[in-house]
C-alpha cells in the first residue's frame, strides 16, 4: 500500500484532558485500563492501552491496571499473567499496585444494601427468560417485575440469604429500581448482583454473589479517583447508568466517562469468544500462535512494541466507527524493521551450486554490511567452491522478464561474484539437484567489462551455513470481513488454508546460527523474519516470517 501519513492523527480526548487541566478541574489526571481476565489481549486492546497509558504519560498523570474480575467462571490466573506481560512488552507500566474489582467487593456489597434501604433496589425472582420478556424491546417499554414492590425488610432479608448461599445459581438477583419505561434499555431495572457459586481466583469461596459490570465499573473508578474513564463506543448507552449509580451512592469522587471508537481491522477477528474457539478447536496452536490477533501472537510473529504503538498513533482516536486496513499495521512493522533489522541471507529451498573453476580448498571471507544505511557493522560470509542458491532462482525455460539464472546466463551473487550456469545435474526423475557454474574472478564488487548483468540473487556457503526451519505465516483469514459467512456457515469457513507453510532444511548464513529468540532480521529478497520466541535456540534456529517485503495482498 502507499505510505500513510506518519504524523499523529487527531485525538479528541487529548484536547479534553488538556482543557480540564487548564480549567483546574483536576490536580492530576488518572486513567485506567480495565480488562476482564477471560482471554489474552488482542490488537484492539492495544489502542486502549496506548490511549490510557499514553494520556497519563503525556500529562504526568497515573494510569491504573484494574482487572474487572466479576465473572469467576470465565477467568483465570493465566490470563492475568499474560495481560500484565503484554502491557509491559508494549512499553507501559501501571501506577502503583495492580488493582482488582474484587478488592472492592465488600464496599460494593455495602453500597448495594444502601440502595435497598433507600428503596432503590429489590430482589427479583424472575429467571433469565422471564426477565427478557418483562424487559421489553427498543420500540416497546418494559413491564415492572412482580417482585419490584417488595418491602425494604424483605429485600434486605433475601439479599442476606443470597449472600449466605441459601439459593442456587440464577434463582434470584438484585436489581436497581430505575425506570422500566426508559428508552435506554440499560436503565430498565438493571441487575446489580447475580448468584454464582464459583471459586474466585482472588477471593476464593468468600462470595457466591457477584456484582454486574455496570454496578462495579463506575464505583471502582470513584474509589480509585479515576478522572477520565475511557471506554469504547458500545458503552455509550451505559453512561446514563454509570452516572445514576454515582449520583445515588456516597462515592468519594465523581469520575466522568468518555467513549471512543474501537479498533476494527479487516482480515481480523478480535472477539474473545471466537479467538478462544480457534484455540480450543485446534485451528491454531494457541493464544500466541503468530497468526492470531492477540498481542502475544503479534509478538511471536515478530512485531515490535514500537510498530504497534506507532500504528495506534497513526489511526488516531475519534468517535467515528469504521474498518482500518490491516495494510496500515503491516506498513508500520515494515517501516520499523526496514530501519532497525540487520540484513542476512537465508535460502528457503536450497539448490547446490558447484563453481567448477574456483580452486578447491580455497575460501575467501567476504564482508557484507549488516544494514545498507545504519552503521551496524559487517558480517562475514565464507565464499568457496560450493554454495546454495534458491531453487526458484534457476529456470531452464524462463518466463518473460526473468532476470535470474538460466542455462548459459549470468547473475551476480549478492556481495560476491558474477557466476554463469553451465550445466544442470538431474536425478532419475528429472529433478534438478545441482548446478555446475563458473565464476568471473574479476567481478568482486564491480561489473564485468562489456557485459551487463541485471540479476542479483542471494546465496549462502555450503560449508558454514546453518540448517534451519522457516515458518511462512500469512493472514489467518482469506476474507476481508471474516465475520461474514454464508448462510448456515461460520467465520471458520473463511480460514485461509495457506496461512502457514513450514519449510525444513533451509540454509542460513553463518551469522544466523547464534540468533537468540526474538532477534529480528530482513532476509534479503524474502521478507522480515524473527527467531521464534518458543522454539528457536542458538544452533537450531526457527524463523517466523513477520511480513513480506511488499504488500503482496494488495496486488491480488
UniProtKB/Swiss-Prot annotation:
EC numbers on record: 6.1.1.18
Q: Where is this motif: 'HIGH' region?
A: 35-45
Q: What Pfam families would the database entry show?
A: tRNA-synt_1c (PF00749), tRNA-synt_1c_C (PF03950), tRNA-synt_1c_C2 (PF20974)
Q: Which PROSITE patterns match?
A: AA_TRNA_LIGASE_I
Subcellular location per UniProt equals: Cytoplasm
Report residues binding ATP.
36-38, 42-48, 232, 262-263
Report the residue ranges where the short sequence motif 'KMSKS' region is annotated in this entry: 269-273
Keyword field: Aminoacyl-tRNA synthetase, ATP-binding, Cytoplasm, Ligase, Nucleotide-binding, Protein biosynthesis
Which GO cellular component terms, listed alphabetically, does the Swiss-Prot or TrEMBL entry include?
Answer: cytosol
A GO term for molecular function: glutamine-tRNA ligase activity
Its principal location?
Answer: cytoplasm
Q: Which HAMAP family match?
A: Gln_tRNA_synth (MF_00126)
Q: How does it assemble?
A: Monomer.
Q: Which protein family is named in the record?
A: Belongs to the class-I aminoacyl-tRNA synthetase family.
Name of the featured protein:
Glutamine--tRNA ligase
What organism is recorded for this protein?
A: Pseudomonas aeruginosa (strain LESB58)
* Organismal lineage: Bacteria, Pseudomonadati, Pseudomonadota, Gammaproteobacteria, Pseudomonadales
Amino acid at each position: 500500500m502507499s505510505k500513510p501519513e506518519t504524523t499523529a492523527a487527531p485525538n479528541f480526548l487529548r484536547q479534553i484532558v488538556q482543557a480540564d487541566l487548564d480549567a483546574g478541574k483536576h490536580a492530576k489526571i488518572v486513567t485506567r485500563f480495565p480488562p476482564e481476565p477471560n482471554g489474552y489481549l488482542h490488537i484492539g486492546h492495544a489502542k486502549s492501552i496506548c490511549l490510557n497509558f499514553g494520556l497519563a504519560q503525556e500529562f504526568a498523570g497515573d494510569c491504573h491496571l484494574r482487572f474487572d474480575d466479576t465473572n469467576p467462571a470465565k477467568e483465570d490466573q493465566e490470563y492475568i499473567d499474560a495481560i500484565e506481560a503484554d502491557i509491559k512488552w508494549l512499553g507501559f507500566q501501571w501506577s502503583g499496585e495492580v488493582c482488582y474489582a474484587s478488592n472492592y467487593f465488600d464496599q460494593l456489597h455495602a453500597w448495594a444494601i444502601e440502595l435497598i434501604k433507600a428503596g432503590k433496589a429489590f430482589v427479583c425472582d424472575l429467571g433469565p427468560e422471564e426477565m427478557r420478556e418483562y424487559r421489553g424491546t427498543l420500540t416497546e417499554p418494559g413491564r415492572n417485575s412482580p417482585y419490584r414492590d417488595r418491602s425494604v425488610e424483605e429485600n434486605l432479608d433475601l439479599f442476606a440469604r443470597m449472600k449466605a448461599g441459601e439459593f442456587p445459581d440464577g434463582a434470584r438477583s438484585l436489581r436497581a429500581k430505575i425506570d422500566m419505561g426508559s428508552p435506554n434499555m440499560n436503565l430498565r431495572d438493571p441487575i446489580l448482583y447475580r448468584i454464582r457459586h464459583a471459586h474466585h481466583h482472588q477471593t476464593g469461596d468468600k462470595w457466591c454473589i457477584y456484582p454486574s459490570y455496570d454496578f462495579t465499573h463506575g464505583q471502582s473508578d470513584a474509589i480509585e479517583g479515576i478522572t477520565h474513564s475511557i471506554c469504547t463506543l458500545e458503552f455509550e448507552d451505559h453512561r446514563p447508568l454509570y452516572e445514576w449509580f454515582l449520583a445515588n451512592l456516597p462515592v468519594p469522587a465523581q469520575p466522568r466517562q468518555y467513549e471512543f471508537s474501537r479498533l476494527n481491522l479487516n482480515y481480523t477477528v478480535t472477539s474473545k469468544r471466537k479467538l478462544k474457539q480457534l484455540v480450543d478447536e485446534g485451528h491454531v496452536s494457541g493464544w500466541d500462535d503468530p497468526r492470531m490477533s492477540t498481542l502475544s501472537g503479534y509478538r511471536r510473529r515478530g512485531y515490535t512494541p514500537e510498530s504497534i504503538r506507532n500504528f495506534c498513533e497513526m489511526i488516531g482516536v475519534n468517535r467515528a466507527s469504521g474498518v482500518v486496513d490491516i495494510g496500515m499495521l503491516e506498513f508500520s512493522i515494515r517501516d520499523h524493521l526496514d530501519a532497525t533489522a540487520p540484513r542476512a541471507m537465508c535460502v528457503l529451498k536450497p539448490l547446490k551450486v558447484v563453481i567448477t573453476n574456483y580452486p578447491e580448498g580455497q575460501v575467501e571471507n567476504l564482508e557484507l554490511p549488516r544494514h545498507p544505511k545504519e552503521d551496524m557493522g559487517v558480517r562475514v560470509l565464507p565464499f568457496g567452491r560450493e554454495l546454495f542458491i534458491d531453487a526458484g532462482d534457476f529456470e531452464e525455460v524462463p518466463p518473460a522478464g526473468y532476470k535470474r539464472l538460466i542455462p548459459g546466463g549470468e547473475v551476480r551473487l549478492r556481495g560476491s561474484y558474477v557466476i554463469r550456469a553451465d550445466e544442470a545435474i538431474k536425478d532419475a526423475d528429472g529433478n534438478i539437484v545441482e548446478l555446475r557454474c563458473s565464476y568471473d574472478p574479476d567481478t568482486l564488487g564491480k561489473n564485468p567489462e562489456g557485459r551487463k548483468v541485471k540479476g542479483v540473487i542471494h546465496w549462502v556457503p555450503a560449508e558454514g551455513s546453518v540448517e534451519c526451519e522457516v515458518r511462512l505465516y500469512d493472514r489467518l483469514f482469506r476474507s476481508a470481513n471474516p465475520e461474514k459467512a454464508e448462510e448456515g456457515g461460520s467465520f471458520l469457513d473463511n480460514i485461509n488454508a495457506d496461512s502457514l507453510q513450514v519449510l525444513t532444511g533451509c540454509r542460513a548464513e553463518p551469522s544466523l546460527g547464534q540468533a537468540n529468540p526474538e532477534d529480528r532480521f530482513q532476509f534479503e529478497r524474502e521478507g522480515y523474519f524473527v527467531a521464534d520466541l518458543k522454539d528457536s535456540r542458538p544452533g537450531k534456529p526457527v524463523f517466523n516470517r513477520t511480513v513480506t517485503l511488499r504488500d503482496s495482498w494488495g496486488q491480488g
